[in-house]
Amino acid sequence: MAYHSFLVEPISCHAWNKDRTQIAICPNNHEVHIYEKSGAKWNKVHELKEHNGQVTGIDWAPESNRIVTCGTDRNAYVWTLKGRTWKPTLVILRINRAARCVRWAPNENKFAVGSGSRVISICYFEQENDWWVCKHIKKPIRSTVLSLDWHPNNVLLAAGSCDFKCRIFSAYIKEVEERPAPTPWGSKMPFGELMFESSSSCGWVHGVCFSAGGSRVAWVSHDSTVCLVDAEKKMAVATLASETLPLLAITFITENSLVAAGHDCFPVLFTYDNAAGTLSFGGRLDVPKQNSQRGLTARERFQNLDKKASSEGGAATGAGLDSLHKNSVSQISVLSGGKAKCSQFCTTGMDGGMSIWDVKSLESALKDLKIR
């Protein structure tokens, strides 16, 4: 495990470049800062300033090296590196509420933006007019879209929203792609077609994720439940009520293992039993260390006042919090190995810190941990 504290401000979202040498983060304001690794240090190399509202989503396309951002100003920008400068292109989303999340499609020929306008904007580039245009997926979304994830086929899109539902839509754009092949989710996929809708969640759906194979979708809700639907099992949904505080992010690290994190400030493992069709709690991945009793320096005390709004010595030192992150984990991303066989993943949190977790090291450190 490697932990780096970038700043006192919370990290509201992040994205990595292709070779994992640079990370783009939002320091909880209208800017995006890009840091580059140099030895053991992270140096700020770029600042992207175009939004006039808080940035709520960042995604970095690995092949085209383009960054897409969205924010509470109801806009999205596609950033292209020209020389040593990132140049923004405005994308009109045609929404009247804040944009909340953004994700590039796997083929990088379109991206999706979820918003408070109860729509998902599917944006693609029109060569004839030399600009980005968007189509809206509207029905039957009844509240803010908080999370998105693409199916590997570049067409299906999973969305979690504040109406307590996880849904899968077709985001097929005939202008930029060929007709998709049938999937376990269905064979007819016109734009906006609802392929699946959950009925088991009882809270805002904070995070959603497709498996590497694309036949499973997992999501986490504000009622502290984790759910997984398997299209190859007649859309059977497995639900587990966890004992943690609400989870905010989730990702597959193998076809049967998932990592999630949220307000408890540490990542946890969940395992799916394919034969039984059930989810189980696999354990906490952040091993608590015995804290040595020591006094706080003035600098540490003021930093912790900012991070945790706490002046109590125990809470400030982390005696009350024995996790690596000292505040809620807001995002998880797979660093290497992909969702099929992840070897490293990254978490960023409201404490302004970023952690890199090595799966093999976690398995050896935690004797009872079995990642299948």
UniProtKB/Swiss-Prot annotation:
SMART domains: WD40 (SM00320). It comes from the Eukaryota. Keywords: Actin-binding, Cytoplasm, Cytoskeleton, Nucleus, Repeat, WD repeat. Transmembrane segments: none annotated. It holds the Pfam family WD40. The keyword Cytoplasm applies. InterPro entries: ARPC1 (IPR017383), WD40/YVTN_repeat-like_dom_sf (IPR015943), WD40_repeat_dom_sf (IPR036322), WD40_rpt (IPR001680). GO terms for biological process: Arp2/3 complex-mediated actin nucleation; response to estradiol; response to estrogen. It is found in: Cytoplasm, Cytoskeleton; Nucleus. Signal peptide: none annotated. Component of the Arp2/3 complex, a multiprotein complex that mediates actin polymerization upon stimulation by nucleation-promoting factor (NPF). The Arp2/3 complex mediates the formation of branched actin networks in the cytoplasm, providing the force for cell motility. In addition to its role in the cytoplasmic cytoskeleton, the Arp2/3 complex also promotes actin polymerization in the nucleus, thereby regulating gene transcription and repair of damaged DNA. This is Actin-related protein 2/3 complex subunit 1B. It comes from Rattus norvegicus. The gene is Arpc1b.
